Design a protein with these regions (language model features):
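Short helix/loop capping segments that flank catalytic or ligand/cofactor-binding pockets
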Residues: 105-107, 201, 219-221, 297, ...
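Short glycine-enriched, charge-decorated loop/helix-capping segments at active-site entrances
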Residues: 111-117, 441-447, 485
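Residues in well-ordered alpha-helical elements
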Residues: 241-244, 402, 493-496
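Gly/Ser-rich catalytic/binding loops embedded in alpha/beta enzyme cores
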Residues: 8, 17, 23-195, 310, ...
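A short, well-structured catalytic beta-strand-centered motif of the EAL phosphodiesterase domain
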Residues: 96, 483-489
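Short, glycine/charged-enriched secondary-structure capping and boundary segments
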Residues: 110-113, 152-155, 204-207, 301-303, ...
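Amidase signature
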Residues: 1-91, 249-457, 464, 490, ...
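Short glycine/serine-rich loop segments
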Residues: 124-255, 464, 468-475, 479-482
Length: 508
C-alpha cells in the first residue's frame, strides 16, 4: 500500500491560491487546508491502481555514449542497436536515428539537456514501434538543441553538432544530430521534430532532404513537447523518396494523440508511392513569396536560389511572385506561442494534459524530480525563453498568446490565397549558408556580439500555418543550400511530388 500524501499548511494553500488567482483570507486558507488534507489521503489508491510497471520487453544492444572517433560530428547522444528480427517491411535494411526527444524503452532520453540525465523511458514512442514493425534498425538517439529550442545545435548540453559539409560550421538545429547523421551516412533515415523549422534547418545546412508534414500527421505519443500546438515530427533522408517512405511508416492516427486524426486526410501511407506520379516540370505552377526572398536573404543564397528557379523554368515550370504579408511578423507570433507553452509545460512538470494516455510514468516521475528546482541546470536560452513566457502569462494574462494563436489562422489563410492557382510555394529554406561555430547570437535579443541573422525566418511560417513543407538540396556547388517547397494543408503528397520533380531536374 502506498503511503498517504503529506498534509499541506495554510501558508501553502495561500500561496497556491494566489498562483491560481484566488484572493484567500487567512481564515479561508485555514479552512481549505483542513478540507484539502482530509481529501488527500484517498489519492494514495491511485498509485496502487496504476503502478509505474516494468519496461517493455526490448532487446536494445550496446547502449553507450559514442567516442569522438566513433562519432566525429557529435551527431549522437547515445548509440545502440535495436531491431525486430522478425519484421520485414518497407524500412528493412535501413539504419534510422531518432531525435533524443522521442522515447526508446530502456535507452536514456535527455532532450539535449543535462537536466534530464537519468530519464529512461519504460516504453517506446509510437513512432519507434512503427519503425521497428517496418523493419528498420534503430542505431541511436540524435543530438539536439536543449529542449529543441535553437537553430544551430549550440545549446545542447552535450556539445554542438558539427556540419559534415564543413566541420567548422554548425549543423543547424534543433534536430542537429538527425541532419548530421544522414549527411555523414551513419543513418539512412532520421526522425526529427519541427516547431519553427527544426527539421528543415539542419537538412538545409547539411545538404539533405527534410520533410515537415501537415500538423497532426505523425502522432506524438512518447514525444517530449516544446510547444504542443506547433510541434511536428518529421523525417530527414538523402532523397525525397526515403523521406516520404519514413512518413508513410510513422504517420497515421493513434488514439494516444487525438491531433493525429487529421492524418486520414493527407494520404499518409501512400506518399512514397505517389512519387511515381510526380508531374513533369512543365506542368508545375509555383509561387515565390516576396517576403521570403527579402533583404534578410544573403547574396550567396539568393543567387543559388535564383539559379534553382531558373532550372525549373528552363524545364518548363511557371514561376511567379506572390505575397504572404503576415509572415514578416511571424517571429513574434511564434515566440508568443512557443515561450508561453514552454513556460506552462515547465510549471506543470511536463504533464501531458492534452493526451489521453496511457503515459510513461518513468519519464513523468523523473521529469518531475529533475525539475524540482524549477529550471536550475537549464542553459540560458531555455531559461530566457521560459521567462519571457512567464511574463506574458503572469503580467499580461496570456492575451498575446491567444492573439498569436488567432494570427496563425490569418497566416494559414494567406498561404491558401498565395497557393490559389499554384501547386506549391518555393523559397530559400535558409537565408544564409551554415554559420561558423560560435558566430550566431545565442539569444534572440540583447547580445551585442555575433552574427544576427533570423535563421528561422523562412521556416517558422509553415509551422504556424500547420502546412506541409520540404527542403531539398539545390544541386549547386559549395556549401549546402536548401530549396523549400510549401503546399496547402493536407497536401502532403503534392508537396513531396513537387520536391521529387525538382530533385529530378536539379540532378540532370
Amino acid at each position: 500500500m502506498t503511503p498517504s500524501l503529506s498534509p499541506v499548511s495554510p501558508a501553502w494553500i495561500a500561496e497556491a491560491g494566489a498562483s491560481l488567482g484566488f484572493d484567500l483570507t487567512e481564515a479561508d486558507a485555514e479552512r481549505f487546508a483542513r478540507s484539502v488534507n482530509a481529501e488527500l489521503d484517498g489519492y494514495a489508491v491511485v498509485d496502487d491502481l496504476a503502478p509505474a510497471g516494468a519496461a517493455e520487453s526490448v532487446d536494445v544492444a550496446d547502449v553507450h555514449h559514442p567516442s569522438a572517433t566513433e562519432d566525429p560530428h557529435n551527431a549522437y547522444i547515445t548509440r545502440f542497436t535495436l531491431v525486430d528480427d522478425g519484421a520485414d517491411g518497407p524500412l528493412s535494411g535501413l539504419d534510422v536515428a531518432v531525435k533524443d526527444n522521442l522515447a526508446v524503452a530502456g535507452v536514456p532520453m535527455t532532450c539535449g539537456s543535462r537536466v534530464f540525465e537519468g530519464v529512461v523511458p519504460r516504453r517506446n514512442a509510437v513512432v519507434v514501434d512503427r519503425l521497428l514493425a517496418a523493419g528498420a534498425r534503430i542505431v541511436g538517439k540524435a543530438n539536439m538543441d536543449e529542449l529543441a529550442y535553437g537553430p544551430t545545435s549550440e545549446t545542447s548540453g552535450f556539445g554542438p553538432v558539427t556540419n559534415p559539409a564543413d566541420p567548422t560550421r554548425v549543423a543547424g538545429g534543433s534536430s542537429s544530430g538527425s541532419g548530421a547523421a544522414v549527411a555523414e551516412g551513419s543513418a539512412d533515415l532520421a526522425l526529427g521534430s519541427d516547431t519553427g523549422g527544426s527539421v528543415r534547418i539542419p537538412a538545409s545546412f547539411c545538404g539533405v532532404v527534410g520533410f515537415k508534414p501537415t500538423w497532426g500527421v505523425v502522432p506524438r505519443d512518447g514525444f517530449v513537447d516544446l510547444a504542443p500546438s506547433l510541434d511536428h515530427v518529421g523525417t530527414l533522408a538523402r532523397d525525397v523518396e526515403t523521406a516520404a517512405l519514413g512518413i508513410d511508416v510513422v504517420g497515421g492516427y493513434d488514439p494516444r494523440d487525438p491531433a493525429s486524426a487529421r492524418a486520414s486526410q493527407t494520404g499518409v501511407g501512400t506518399c512514397a508511392a505517389a512519387l511515381a506520379a510526380a508531374p513533369d516540370a512543365a506542368d508545375l505552377s509555383l509561387g515565390v513569396p516576396d517576403e521570403l526572398l527579402a533583404d534578410h536573404v544573403s547574396d550567396e543564397v539568393r543567387e543559388r536560389f535564383e539559379a534553382a528557379v531558373s532550372t525549373l523554368e528552363a524545364a518548363g515550370a511557371t514561376v511567379e511572385r506572390v505575397a504572404v504579408p503576415t509572415v514578416a511578423d511571424a517571429v513574434y507570433v511564434w515566440n508568443a506561442i512557443t515561450n508561453v507553452e514552454l513556460a506552462a509545460a515547465l510549471r506543470r512538470r511536463s504533464l501531458p494534459l492534452d493526451r489521453p494516455g496511457p503515459h510513461d510514468l518513468a519519464r513523468l516521475d523523473a521529469t518531475a524530480a529533475s525539475q524540482s528546482a524549477r529550471g536550475v541546470g537549464f542553459g540560458d536560452v531555455a531559461r530566457e525563453r521560459a521567462l519571457v513566457g512567464a511574463v506574458l502569462l503572469d503580467r499580461y494574462g496570456g492575451r498575446h498568446y491567444t492573439r498569436a494563436r488567432n494570427a496563425c489562422a490569418r497566416i494559414a489563410d494567406e498561404f491558401a490565397a498565395a497557393l490559389n492557382g499554384h501547386d506549391a510555394l518555393v523559397a530559400p529554406t535558409m537565408p544564409v549558408v551554415a554559420p561558423e561555430l560560435g558566430a550566431q547570437k545565442p539569444h534572440s535579443y540583447g547580445d551585442d556580439d555575433g552574427l544576427d541573422v533570423p535563421l528561422a525566418f523562412n521556416t517558422r511560417p509553415a509551422d504556424l500555418a500547420g502546412v506541409p513543407a520540404v527542403t531539398v538540396p539545390d544541386g549547386g556547388d559549395g556549401l549546402p543550400v536548401g530549396v523549400q517547397f510549401v503546399a496547402g494543408r493536407c497536401e502532403d503528397r503534392t508537396v513531396l511530388q513537387v520536391a521529387r520533380t525538382f530533385e529530378r531536374v536539379s540532378d540532370t
